[in-house]
Each structure stands twice: as C-alpha cells, then as structure tokens.
Amino acid sequence: LPDWFVFQKLLAASISHSIVESGLDQIGGYVTEASSVVGLRTPADLLAAYGVDSAPEFADVVRFEQPRIATFSKPSNSDRPWRDFPHGFLLGGSLAPVWRMSRTRFSYGAEYWRIRSDGEQKRLSRYEGAARGWVGAKRWRPPSPIVGTLARWQGREYFADVIAENVLLTAIADEGPAGFEGVRPRVWSATVPLSECEVFERVFTAQVDGVPVRILRHAGENAEVLLLSDEPADAERVDAGRVEAGVFEAVVAAGRLADVHGVENQWVPSADK
C-alpha cells in the first residue's frame, strides 16, 4: 500500500441510501485507488471492473483520503457466491489495485459522487466530520465510540477528525467544554493542534454462536455487529444481512456476545510518512 492517497469505493444502493437518509458515517470493505480508475467514466465501465454486467443510468462512489488507523488486506481467494478479486486487482484493463479495508469512519472531506451514463460526474455531498456529518443529509447519526478515530486532549476523550496538522474534536454532552462551538443540540466542536493530541481507536471483537464479529455499536440490550467472516454459512447462522459483497452485519441481543475483547490502536503520525 502506498504511503498516502485517495481511495474510491463503489457504493451499493443500500449504502448510498443510508448516506442520504440517515447520515451513515462508516465505511469499509472493497476500496481501490481513485487515480487508477479515472478511465472508468461510465457506470457500465465501472461495474464491469467489478464483474457486474449492467448499464444503469448512474453509479455512486465515494472518494476519500486514506483513513487514519484503518487496516488493509488483500481480497479473499476463497470460492464465494459473489465476484472477488483474488489477484488483488479489479477486472478488465484498468489494473486498479483493490483492497479490503477495516471498518472505520469516513475521513474528513470525503466526497459522495454520482457518475451518469453520459459520463457526467456530479458531487452530491461532502463529509465534514463527526459533529457535522454529510452536508445535506436528511439526518445526522451520532458517531459510534468504537468505530473510527478518537483523541485524548487535555485529559478528556473526544471523537476526532484529523485534518492535516490539526484535529477537529467533537464532544457529545449537555454542556460543551470551554472554547467549543455548538454545532447542533448536545454536539460541540473545536479545532486543536495535532501535536497536543493522542489519536487512537477502540476495537471490540466477540463471538456470536461461534462466529467472530466486531461490535459496531452497543445500545441498550442490542448490539450492531460486523461479521469478521465472509463465509455465507456463518452469516446464515447468526441471521446476518449482506450489506455488500463479502460484508455481513447483524443486530443481536447483547446477551449473545461471548468472548468479548477490546483493543486500543494508537496512531503514530510518522508511520504514515
């Protein structure tokens, strides 16, 4: 993986809908290098590179900077009921490298684009961090504290969006910390130097009926989980739904979570250079 660049992700219709309707702020799964697919100028060309023979009126993509702390792996070479990329490249002549990216929040400045069949491209929205979310989305969903970057600053923890040498901190509280600006009810934001922050993420994993999962959100008696297996039989066992190729999610009773483990991954800025 190169040191730093912009990714592009082809969006399943359900994900496009969730961005617009409910402010979906998480991303993962198959991603490719944006500069390697600039020649795929129509929905048909783009979908063909993913092994889909279709020519819809439009296709939606999101373009975003490499998220901090996200991890990348080669696609599976197992036999699956969907098109995979065992050689690590999209299909056809683009030779665009493709990776599977761990689940994280969108990086600040991510852009949601629509590519039309006549080749026109139009930016529909832009992600402006944990506090503000997607511009023009119908709803804002509070970020999950166990998906995406956090920061410690002056002894407190905040949601964090790293922007060059600064960090956009977000607090969700009845009253904002001193110097923070109110963005929406109970949501506060401030920009501070990166050098004053410790940036990290928390990842919780568990087992549900023997299937490995990552916990995405824990609310009351239920938990939203991402399967860490792309085996269809595992998805069926826990009644998980397929979000996109190779990605399964489920809402389960918290009591079904076994062998829960948490890890804190620190971001070292020099590691990205």
Regions found by a protein language model. Give the residues of each.
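Short, surface-exposed polybasic-aromatic patches that bind anionic ligands, especially phosphate groups
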Residues: 1-273
